[in-house]
Amino acid sequence: MTYFVVFLGLCFVLGGLAVASNPSPYYGVVGLVLASVVGCGWLLSLGVSFVSLVLFMVYLGGMLVVFVYSVSLAADPFPEAWGDWGVVGYGASFVVVLMVGGVIGGFVGGWDFGVVTVDSVGVFSARLDFSGVAMFYSCGVGMFLVAGWGLVLTLFVVLELVRGLSRGAIRAV
């Protein structure tokens, strides 16, 4: 299990590197999807299954909007790929920065943290995840409404930007 969590952590870092060193919007969206799927898998391995599922569904919807927006506005006839030398050098510089940060963080002692997700007292075992479900639907109603309104507003902004010159969402390239 430890190897799996370390593998998910490395994939999350690679997804972040793919977003940071994206040569084209197509590849940036792939990096975002990779990072979100691996992050939700990481939460799932820690035992927070409901929050992981909710975040995965929200990220999947968000990535769909980002993908449509970036593909509609990308006008590169020959986009660069991840194998081009400029992109490889850019990604390698990010890896060096992450390694130096990891070494400095290891010397300072920034790795002393722990995550506990299951409380067990005797026979009873109450998962912290299910108390989060109750908080989502009781105290978080206002935040859900604000987040929903923000997503609807973002959808209208993206549709207006993609619309072009009064020709609707489909336009000739």
Swiss-Prot record:
Tagged with keyword Membrane: yes
Gene Ontology terms, MF aspect: NADH dehydrogenase (ubiquinone) activity
Superkingdom of origin: Eukaryota
GO cellular component labels: mitochondrial membrane
Pfam entry (one): Oxidored_q3
Keywords of the record: Electron transport, Membrane, Mitochondrion, NAD, Respiratory chain, Translocase, Transmembrane, Transmembrane helix, Transport, Ubiquinone
Membrane topology annotation: Multi-pass membrane protein
Catalytic activity, as annotated: a ubiquinone + NADH + 5 H(+)(in) = a ubiquinol + NAD(+) + 4 H(+)(out)
InterPro entries, per database record: ComplexI_Subunit6, NADH_UbQ/plastoQ_OxRdtase_su6, Nuo/plastoQ_OxRdtase_6_NuoJ
Subcellular location: Mitochondrion membrane
Assigned protein family: Belongs to the complex I subunit 6 family.
PANTHER family: NADH UBIQUINONE OXIDOREDUCTASE SUBUNIT ND6 (PTHR11435), NADH-UBIQUINONE OXIDOREDUCTASE CHAIN 6 (PTHR11435:SF1)
Name this protein carries in UniProt: NADH-ubiquinone oxidoreductase chain 6
Species of provenance: Cepphus columba (Pigeon guillemot)
Lineage: Eukaryota, Metazoa, Chordata, Craniata, Vertebrata
